Amino acid sequence: MIKTTRKSKREKEKEINFFEAFIKLQKHFFKDIKERLKRVKDPRHKSYIEYGSDVILFSVLMKNACGIYSMSNMIEQFNKDECIENIARVLGCELEELPHYDTINNFLCSLNPEEIEKIRDYMIRELFRKRSLESFRLLNKHWCIAVDATGLFSFSERHCEHCLKKEYKNKETGEIEKTVYYHKVLEAKMVVGDMVFSIATEFIENEDENVSKQDCEINAFKRLAAKLRKKYPRLPVGILGDSLYACEPVFEICSSNNWEYLIRFKEGRIKSVAREFNNIKGLEGKKTGDSTWINDIFYNQRVVILIET
Ligand SMILES: [Zn+2]
């Protein structure tokens, strides 16, 4: 095995012309993408539009494809005649300058996220249509989709009416010492070899400030699953999740959608299953290497398989 250090990775990346590589891929897989970038529902007032949505979104796509993390860094790196000409040539338009990052940020802030989702969906459908993802099916059947939530940002004061809220209390007095307002997103990521890409997204957020029960990851999963099912009704899905997902609502959604699931198990999450496994693993457990598994564990009228590694 060749160990890749970060430095050698960076050196190697320098040799790649990401722009050309992206254009090659785009021509082969996503012929229609330029049109789609142009057709997004532009939230801006027509009289203020200096750069088309295609120029802005394409610049951002290139930023990400080139592994540039900040907008200001992008402008610094892209604002060269050659680069501007390349982008203009690809999009078939006249360009003297690239949009300022404030212009890009303002546009992205006002754009409905669904407009970006439509472009992502188009790209994923093209990959399925061209059968480019066939070799990544588990047991030649299911595509693994990992679900997990991640924090987006947090604030010490309320930032909007949809914020989730967490109060930290003093253990002795019970007084609230600190309140944190935060936003989270639940992502469904398709696993393709050693890469993953986002296939569906659901924000975890409250409807308003006065909700009696806050939104949570499992509720967001219910919405995410409905979205995924609507977008790809016949996709053979295998859900991968951490131990939080080992619960009846998730099992129920998966069975009714004909999805398989592979979920990490923690003893505390479903005690009856843990008890049964521990009671019979010495007698009926099958072993291979360091792993022991039991095929038929009954839980809420369903049968689960538990593997201990
Ligand atoms: Zn907020």
Residue ranges and their predicted role:
Residues 23, 27-99, 105:
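Gly/serine-rich nucleotide phosphate-binding loop at the start of the catalytic core
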Residues 211-273:
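Domain-level cores of phosphate- or acyl-group-handling catalytic modules
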Residues 149, 190-192, 203-205, 243, ...:
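Short, structured patches in soluble enzyme cores that scaffold and shape functional sites
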Residues 169-235:
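Electropositive, glycine- and tryptophan-enriched low-complexity nucleic-acid-binding patches
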Residues 59, 74-75, 100, 104, ...:
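Short, conserved catalytic/metal-binding motifs centered on acidic residues
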Residues 266-309:
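An anionic, glycine-rich sequence signature occurring as long contiguous blocks
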Residues 1-34:
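Charged, often Cys/His-bearing segments associated with DNA-binding zinc-finger transcription factors
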Residues 105-195:
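Active-site-proximal, Lys/Arg-enriched surface segment
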